[in-house]
Curated annotation (Swiss-Prot):
The keyword rRNA-binding does not apply. InterPro entries: Uncharacterised_Ycf20. One of its GO terms (cellular component) is chloroplast. It holds the Pfam family DUF565. Keywords: Chloroplast, Plastid. The gene is ycf20. It is found in: Plastid, Chloroplast. Belongs to the ycf20 family. This is Uncharacterized protein ycf20. PANTHER family: PTHR33787, YCF20-LIKE PROTEIN.
Length: 100
């Protein structure tokens, strides 16, 4: 019985740590997007060019990472993917703020 509880505890510990790492990377990506989009706005009207560069870099990274099947379950790749999702989410939120 104790062994079963130990296995369940280890399973939950791994998944809770994985979930917290994914949430932190998502919020970090959102924070990066806020920083990246705020700096060019102060110096001029560079919003469209900044968004174009961010999406271009994001798609290039995705093409490089997902071209190899051995990197699909790597924790670093999952963290980078969470940061990329946070950056794209930040772009959507920023565009809705500008539209209202």
């Amino acid at each position: 019985m104790q062994f079963i509880l130990y296995i369940i505890g280890q399973y939950l510990y791994y998944h809770i740590n994985n979930l917290s790492l994914q949430l932190i990377s998502l919020f970090l990506g959102y924070f990066f997007c806020t920083i990246i989009c705020s700096i060019p706005k102060e110096t001029g009207d560079w919003g469209l060019i900044t968004a174009l560069l961010i999406v271009g870099i994001n798609e290039t990274m995705s093409a490089l990472i997902y071209s190899y099947k051995k990197y699909e379950n790597n924790i670093i790749v999952k963290t980078i993917n969470g940061i990329k999702i946070g950056i794209i989410y930040g772009l959507f939120v920023d565009s809705f703020k500008l539209g209202s």
